[in-house]
């Protein structure tokens, strides 16, 4: 029998306890739990806390990624606006259209009264509340917002997507597009969004007179011509200035306006169909009284040279004068025009009653 001193026994006990704490006992691996799908109910998918917001997000993410720069900007504006309100709907509730949403939709449906095509705006059909589920609600709300911004774009000439390709080069203007972020923020905050939409159209009195003429002739051939003129006014700057000059090309007249009232008018010379007058808007910097007209190259080549080879009647009829390129006068009768090239000379019309530029330009 071996005797162990008490103090060694105590030390060994302490070591045993310490060792037990430091070394974990080996564990036995548990067998996997096998469930029988025949008797185990399936796990329900997580419930969407806000299905309407989810539908809004889904609709926004599914919008096309191509289009004009303005269209892409509009989509970005909508995404940011909805995100700021946690994708809550703007124009609809579970009970259907809000009063503001109904007013907005009703005004868009009247787009034809303003010369616009209501079919372009693709307003959604809103079902009765009993059939208005979250998916339909969220999708329709975004579609109404898209229609609003598209209406604003078309109200200011934006329905012609590629002016440089689709329009005559004589039209030297740009659509007066409004900032979509400003438009949407103001429309969403407006107590009367219908009135806000009406206010997006040009405010020039000429536009309103054309609109009334369009309404009176809708369905008649004349209506298309009126629509074309209304569209030109959508491209006109909103502010023409306290004083401005307006040339009415079909009327052969120019008007001087001050504070919205015509204070002077003059007859003007305009181009023929094949040589149309350019339609433009620019700040007026210079006025020339009793101007001299320098005949353009195309007129010299296609009209004057053939006439000089015949009898030079146009030179006599219009008091035209011939000059060298450095401005020295020449007698056109001393030149053999069967050999000479008129492009080597300048043709001018001095100031006077026959001058095609009139008394001022």
Model regions and ranges:
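Bacterial N-terminal signal peptides that target proteins for export
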Residues: 2-10
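Boundary at the C-terminal end of the N-terminal hydrophobic targeting segment
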Residues: 21-29
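Bacterial N-terminal signal peptides
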Residues: 10-19
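Cationic-aromatic interfacial patches
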Residues: 28-173
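Well-ordered beta-sheet/strand-loop patches within structured domains
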Residues: 31-72, 142, 146-150, 154, ...
């Amino acid at each position: 029998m071996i005797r162990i001193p008490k103090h060694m026994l105590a030390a060994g006990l302490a070591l045993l306890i310490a060792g037990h704490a430091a070394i974990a006992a080996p564990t036995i691996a548990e067998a996997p739990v096998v469930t029988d799908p025949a008797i185990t109910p399936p796990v329900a998918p997580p419930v969407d806390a806000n299905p309407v917001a989810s539908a809004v997000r889904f609709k926004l993410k599914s919008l096309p990624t191509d289009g004009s720069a303005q269209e892409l900007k509009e989509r970005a504006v909508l995404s940011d606006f909805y995100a700021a309100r946690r994708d809550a709907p703007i124009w609809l509730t579970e009970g259907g259209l809000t009063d503001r949403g109904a007013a907005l939709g009703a005004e868009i449906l009247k787009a034809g009264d303003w010369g616009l095509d209501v079919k372009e705006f693709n307003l959604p059909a809103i079902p009765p509340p009993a059939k208005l589920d979250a998916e339909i609600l969220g999708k329709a709300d975004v579609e109404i917002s898209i229609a609003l911004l598209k209406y604003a774009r078309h109200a200011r000439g934006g329905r012609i997507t590629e002016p440089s390709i689709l329009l005559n080069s004589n039209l030297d203007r740009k659509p007066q597009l409004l900032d979509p972020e400003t438009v949407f923020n103001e429309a969403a905050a407006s107590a009367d969004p219908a009135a806000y939409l009406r206010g997006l159209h040009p405010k020039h009195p000429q536009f309103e007179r054309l609109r009334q003429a369009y309404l009176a002739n809708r369905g008649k051939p004349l209506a298309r011509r009126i629509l074309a003129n209304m569209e030109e006014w959508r491209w006109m700057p909103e502010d023409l200035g306290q004083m401005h000059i307006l040339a009415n090309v079909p009327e052969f007249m120019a008007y001087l306006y001050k504070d919205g009232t015509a204070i002077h008018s003059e007859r003007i010379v305009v181009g023929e169909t094949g040589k149309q007058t350019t339609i433009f808007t620019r700040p007026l910097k210079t006025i020339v009284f009793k101007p001299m007209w320098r005949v353009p190259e195309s007129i010299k080549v296609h009209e004057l040279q053939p006439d000089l080879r015949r009898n030079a009647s146009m030179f006599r009829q219009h008091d035209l004068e011939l000059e060298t390129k450095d401005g020295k006068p020449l007698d056109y009768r001393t030149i053999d025009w069967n050999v000479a090239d008129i492009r080597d000379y300048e043709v001018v019309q001095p100031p006077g009653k026959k001058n095609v530029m009139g008394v001022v330009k």
